[in-house]
Amino acid sequence: LEFRRVLFRSQADVIVAAGLRFNWILQSGAIIPPSAKVVRIDIDPHEIDRNRMADVGLVGDVGSVLSQLTPLLNQRDHSGWIETLRAASSSLLDYEIRMRANPSDPIHPLRLVARIQEFAGEDALYIADGGDTVYFGITGFSSRHRAGVIGTASGLLGCLGTGIPFAMAAKLARPERKVILLNGDGSMGFNAMEFDTMVRHNIPIVCVVNNDCAWGMIKHSQELSLGKERLQCSELGLRHYEKMVEGLGGYGELVTSDDEIVPALERAVASGKPACINVITDPTVTSPATPLFYQSLRMDQ
């Protein structure tokens, strides 16, 4: 939250948007402090004043323009601002490190990611699909391979629910490597029946469901806007995806405690089948991405 406050509620007097579109993620520009001067750099002249008028507009290739502006930065002392950003980033990083090392139940999603990484190592290929689940995955997984960590919902064209087909493609392209899919329980519902395809065509990925029994990002956004007593259509309840996968001929296992995670993963890989490890995680946890998502959808700012 401190990281969000510094970056998006700062007292910055000038903001340089280099090739950045003022779309819904930035509340069409409304998330920028009204007092700030805005410099926009874009190769497309139509973007310069889109959604928010620029105080200074520079039309051109971002790389070329910035290479001309960079020498000017050395003329001013930015050390104070840099330290502010470093402190905010360090605060968030410290929190993530503590949660990865926390073995208590209910399982924190970052702890789940740490356990998966402990098991599969840097030779595996990782895909993260969902809302908060994508954040937890891409910040926690590490792979030595190019494109070894993929978040399906990244950017404007990221598509919820594509984790399963992404994982299938990764396993077909690199059958010798472990392919681990971290799936939210909401995103699991989009293409879960493709486990039938995986069984028939022998595509043994391991899908780990980060199951908080909800559309987590939506639920926590509703808590921010409506309160915990007025949740609408965001609670999913416990669904036994592991049993569905077993019914299709794959391997399934339910996990409810930290010490069960790695043994379950070992059994999943040893089965040689497409596998689903359904892990019940802490339903109260959200990621720093959720407040940003909530702010981006607010129309009163």
Where are these regions (language model features)?
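An anion/phosphate-binding loop that grips the pyrophosphate of nucleotide cofactors and donors
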Residues: A12
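Glycine/threonine-rich flexible loop motifs
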Residues: F22-I31, S287-P288
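Thiamine diphosphate
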Residues: R9, I48-V59, G63-L69, Y135-Q301
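Active-site diphosphate/adenylate-binding microenvironment
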Residues: S89-P165, R298
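A short helix->loop->beta-strand "cap" motif at the edges of active sites that frequently abuts
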Residues: P34-K37
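Short, small-residue-biased leader/transition segments that mark boundaries at the very start
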Residues: L1-L7
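Flexible, glycine/charged-enriched surface loops at secondary-structure junctions
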Residues: Q75-S89, C276
